Amino acid sequence: MLEKFERYPLTFGPTPIERLGRLSAHLGGQVELYAKREDCNSGLAFGGNKLRKLEYIVPDAIASGADTLVSIGGVQSNHTRMVAAVAAKIGMKCRLVQEAWVPHEDAVYDRVGNIMLSRILGADVRLVDDGFDIGIRSSWQEAIDDVKAKGGRPYAIPAGASVHKFGGLGYVGFAEEVRAQERDLGFTFDYIVVCTVTGSTHAGMVVGFAKDGRERRVIGIDASATPAQTKAQVLDIARRTADLVGLGRDLSADDVVLNEDYAYPVYGVPSQETKDAIRLCARLEGMITDPVYEGKSMQGMIDLVRKGFFPAGSKVLYAHLGGAPALNGYGYTFRNG
C-alpha cells in the first residue's frame, strides 16, 4: 500500500512483539496479551510512534527546501521531542511551540523529560499559555510566520504530525508489518489496542487493517477527553489516508472504534486507576508506560479484559507508542513509586 511513497529511514526496522504472559495470567489467563514495542523503534532520542509518521514527512520537508522544522505540542509533548531529534538528524533547525495543555503542577514540569530533551537537541523552545486543543493553533502559525520574518524557510508539522497530508501513512505501514509478523507467529491478532488523541496513529491503523477486514478490531482508547472532536479527526485522517494509498473503499464513522471511558479527569492528568495500571504493568512485565497516553490505554485494556469485552481465547495486541520520558514531569505523583 505504501510502495509509491518515499520514506526516510529513522527506525531500526520492524518493532518486536512481546508476549505479556504475567499480565495475562494476572487477569485470569483467558485472554492472551501481547505488546508491539513502538517505544523501542529507534535510537533517536528514545524513539516512539511519531517516528513512523515522520519517516514519510521528512522527504517532503527536504524537497521543500526548508531549513527549519516548526511544530507544536504540550509542555511534555513526545511529538515535539521527536521533531527536535529528527531536525538534528537531518541537519535542520527546529522551532517548537509548547502550550500549557495539561493542568498539572510539578515543580520541574517544564524543565525535565521531553522538553529538556528538546532543548538538549538544540530546538528553539517557546512556552505558550494556551490550553489543550487537537486542532490547528494560532500560536503555531505565529511561530511559522516568525521564522519566515527572520529569513528562515519553515516546514510546518502539526501537533502529533496528525493532520499533515502524510500523517497517517506510518501506521498503515504498522498494519502491514503486523501482518508479516503474524505469518511468522502462526496466528492473527483478534484486537489491536491503541491510545488515541490527535488521531493519525489510530487512523493509519484503521486504513491498514481495513485491507484484511479488521478496521473495527482496532480499539482506540481516548486520552484526549474531547472524544467527539478526536473521533471526527480520526475519521477525517483515515478517509484522506485511504484515498492516498488507494484502499478502494469508503470508511464510515462505525469503522472508528473509540472508547471514551478512560481519559478522565482531563488530558494529561492520570486518574488513580491510570496510576494503578502503570504500576501493575511495570511490576508484572517491567514495561514502563506514561501518565498521559500509554498509562490510559493500558488502564483501558486491563479494564476491558476484566469486564469480558474480549472473548475467551482472544489474542490482543497492545500498541506501545512510547512516551516514558514524560514520567520525569510527574516526579511528585510517583515519588513513592
UniProtKB/Swiss-Prot annotation:
Homotrimer. One of its GO terms (biological process) is 1-aminocyclopropane-1-carboxylate metabolic process. Its EC number is 3.5.99.7. The keyword Hydrolase applies. The lineage of its organism: Bacteria, Pseudomonadati, Pseudomonadota, Alphaproteobacteria, Hyphomicrobiales. GO terms for molecular function: 1-aminocyclopropane-1-carboxylate deaminase activity; D-cysteine desulfhydrase activity; pyridoxal phosphate binding. The active site is at S77. Belongs to the ACC deaminase/D-cysteine desulfhydrase family. The modification N6-(pyridoxal phosphate)lysine is found at K50. The keyword Hydrolase applies. It catalyses: 1-aminocyclopropane-1-carboxylate + H2O = 2-oxobutanoate + NH4(+). It comes from Methylobacterium nodulans (strain LMG 21967 / CNCM I-2342 / ORS 2060). InterPro entries: ACCD_DCysDesulf, ACP_carboxylate_deaminase, ACP_carboxylate_deaminase_bac, TrpB-like_PALP, TrpB-like_PALP_sf. This is 1-aminocyclopropane-1-carboxylate deaminase.
